[in-house]
Amino acid sequence: MSKSASRARLLEIIRRRSFGRGEVTLASGRKSDFYFNLKPTMMDPEGATLLAELTYEALKDDGYDYIGGLEMGAVPLAGAIAQISWIKGHPIAAFFVRKKPKEHGARLAIEGLTRDETLAGKRIVVVEDVTTTGGSAMKAVETLREAGAEVSLVFTMVDREEGAAEAFAAAGLSFRALYKAREFL
């Protein structure tokens, strides 16, 4: 399937499985008359594959060492993208950032690394399913930067276009999206 055909097919899947109308309160606290819940698309075999392939194709030439983001939305995305990257011969390892470190066991804030691995000095792309103001992604970015990671890009599946681009620019981050919310409205 061509890139444009894959993109069109994924838009259909997101519209059917993950887009809805009705008043909701977003993670940012804002009210909206439409919403995206990408988890049904991320858990669908075709949807997950298309999300991963299109994201991988957008990132493959940028030289990233790791891909990940804040739990929960980034977990299936990062795993699927890592798998596709290995299949395509250009591995990008995955991780995820906990909203708060575990209070037992190793008490980690960043999961997916071995005891000997570090993100210090590594090129990281933060990925998320839906971005509104950028607050959730910035939590991950802050944790990663504290760990010494070089975070330069936030990549989202759907940008609601409600201030995230400006917030990321102010933090010295590039921002890219597979889709803009207006493509579904």
Swiss-Prot record:
Tell me the residue numbers annotated for binding orotate.
Answer: 132, 160
According to the lineage, what is the superkingdom?
A: Bacteria
Q: What class of enzyme is it?
A: transferase
User: What metabolic or biological pathway is this protein involved in?
Assistant: Pyrimidine metabolism; UMP biosynthesis via de novo pathway; UMP from orotate: step 1/2
| Cofactor dependency | Mg(2+)
E.C. number: 2.4.2.10
Record-listed 5-phospho-alpha-D-ribose 1-diphosphate binding positions: 98-99, 102, 104, 128-136
Q: Which GO terms describe its molecular function?
A: magnesium ion binding; orotate phosphoribosyltransferase activity
Record field: catalytic activity: orotidine 5'-phosphate + diphosphate = orotate + 5-phospho-alpha-D-ribose 1-diphosphate
Q: Which InterPro entries match?
A: OPRT, Or_phspho_trans_dom, PRibTrfase_dom, PRTase-like
Keywords associated with the record: Glycosyltransferase, Magnesium, Pyrimidine biosynthesis, Transferase
The record's listing under SUPFAM superfamilies reads:
PRTase-like (SSF53271)
- Provide one Gene Ontology biological process annotation: pyrimidine nucleobase biosynthetic process
What family is this?
Belongs to the purine/pyrimidine phosphoribosyltransferase family. PyrE subfamily.
Give the multimer and partner information.
Answer: Homodimer.
Q: Which NCBIfam families match?
A: pyrE (TIGR00336)
Q: What does this protein do?
A: Catalyzes the transfer of a ribosyl phosphate group from 5-phosphoribose 1-diphosphate to orotate, leading to the formation of orotidine monophosphate (OMP).
What is this protein's record name? Answer: Orotate phosphoribosyltransferase
Q: Which organism is it from?
A: Bradyrhizobium sp. (strain ORS 278)
Organism ancestry? Bacteria, Pseudomonadati, Pseudomonadota, Alphaproteobacteria, Hyphomicrobiales
Q: Which gene encodes it?
A: pyrE
